[in-house]
């Protein structure tokens, strides 16, 4: 029996490959320092867990509306107004099984075979394959380290064709940690507005910004931006809720209705009791978010200081998320070879940049303890000296 062409063209995940090797080594008792984590190493705050437990004990375990419980959709609309300057009705908000699910729903609702979707690289690993799954074509726009790994408006414009249907933006960005300024986003919106192109704005890392960086929601920039933008966010990164699988999108009414219809025929509703936890996350004390950001900031600064002292590697200071993208091209290895050798020789797991569309780089996550960061960077430095 054959599988479908769409399934066959999906690329195996390099992130999962490295992760599985690292876990196998740990299972054998090997001391592996893992820098591959794409999730906070903190526990979900207690008041969120308590709300979900209370929902379970109260029997809130049945189906909910496919787009999410009304009170959560309303709370998200209120959050978007307060935090992001966005005016959405609850009916324009669709709750899903994670921000990843929301991204795919948005692409499926707006793109079709023959369409092109522009994606700046380095990119989050799943974007191109999501585009391929709906039969559209990803168009990759490389960015440069000297530009802080950010796509310029002219790069976007040069990549456009009559088939361009969507631009995917991720700020703060995984894997680069780049945060686009309002001026940079306004220039990009100006290009999209002239061609009536959707913008999928993945803002899952919005709460994790550092120094003087400010997160700006693209849809807040102008009415035209609002009309073109599908805003995606969730609870995984800000509230350490990766396993709860809850994300959401907010979009123009026609797109939101299409996504609701799609979701009703695929996954139906997100987990009922997880939604109650998410409601508590939005309504409750936000101190845990600030505490987590402060700890990440300390780790970020330590990691950057250590990396700056290693010859022949460079790293742009990330302004958001919890990753550092390290350029190792001067060391003479592909990113996959570098990651494989680093793991096998030094017991350090990193993600090769090839997974993100840039083979010059590797990604290090500081979503792990400072002790592991110190030990892992000692090994990383010793390994680089052997090349």
Residue ranges of model-derived segments:
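Conserved N-terminal alpha-helix of the aminotransferase class I/II PLP-enzyme fold
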Residues: 63-96
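PLP-dependent class I/II
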Residues: 3, 7-13, 18, 25-33, ...
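A glycine-/small-polar-enriched, mobile loop at the entrance of the PLP active site in fold-type I
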Residues: 36-39, 54-73
């Amino acid at each position: 029996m054959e599988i479908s062409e769409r399934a066959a063209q999906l690329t195996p995940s390099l992130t999962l490959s490295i992760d599985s090797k690292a876990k196998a080594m740990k299972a054998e008792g090997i001391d592996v320092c893992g820098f591959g984590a794409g999730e906070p190493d903190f526990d979900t705050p207690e008041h969120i867990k308590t709300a979900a437990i209370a929902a379970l004990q109260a029997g809130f375990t049945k189906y909910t509306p496919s787009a999410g419980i009304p009170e959560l959709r309303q709370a998200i609309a209120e959050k978007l107004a307060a935090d992001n300057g966005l005016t959405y009705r609850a009916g324009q908000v669709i709750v899903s099984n994670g921000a990843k699910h929301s991204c795919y729903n948005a692409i499926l609702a707006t793109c079709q075979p023959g369409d092109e979707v522009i994606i700046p690289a380095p990119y989050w690993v799943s974007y191109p394959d999501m585009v391929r799954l709906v039969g559209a074509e990803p168009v990759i726009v490389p960015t440069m380290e000297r530009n802080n790994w950010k796509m310029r408006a002219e790069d976007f414009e040069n990549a456009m064709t009559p088939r361009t249907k969507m631009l995917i933006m991720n700020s703060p960005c995984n894997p680069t940690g780049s945060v686009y300024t309002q001026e940079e986003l306004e220039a990009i919106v100006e290009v999209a507005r002239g061609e009536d192109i959707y913008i999928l704005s993945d803002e899952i890392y919005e709460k994790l910004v550092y120094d003087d960086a400010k997160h700006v929601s693209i849809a807040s920039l102008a009415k035209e931006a609002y009309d073109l933008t599908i805003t995606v966010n969730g609870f995984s990164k800000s509230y350490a809720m990766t396993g709860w699988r809850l994300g959401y999108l907010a979009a123009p009414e026609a797109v939101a209705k299409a996504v609701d219809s799609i979701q009703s025929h695929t996954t139906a509703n997100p987990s009922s009791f997880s939604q109650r936890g998410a409601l508590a996350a939005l309504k409750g004390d936000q101190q845990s978010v600030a505490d987590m950001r402060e700890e990440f900031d300390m780790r970020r600064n330590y990691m950057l200081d250590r990396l700056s002292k290693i010859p022949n590697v460079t790293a742009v200071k990330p302004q958001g998320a919890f990753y550092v993208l390290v350029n190792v091209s001067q060391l003479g290895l592909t990113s996959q070879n570098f990651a494989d050798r680093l793991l096998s020789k030094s017991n350090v797991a990193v993600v090769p940049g090839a997974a993100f569309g840039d083979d010059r780089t590797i990604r290090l996550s500081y979503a792990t303890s400072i002790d592991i960061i110190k030990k892992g960077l000692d090994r990383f430095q010793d390994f680089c000296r052997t090349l």
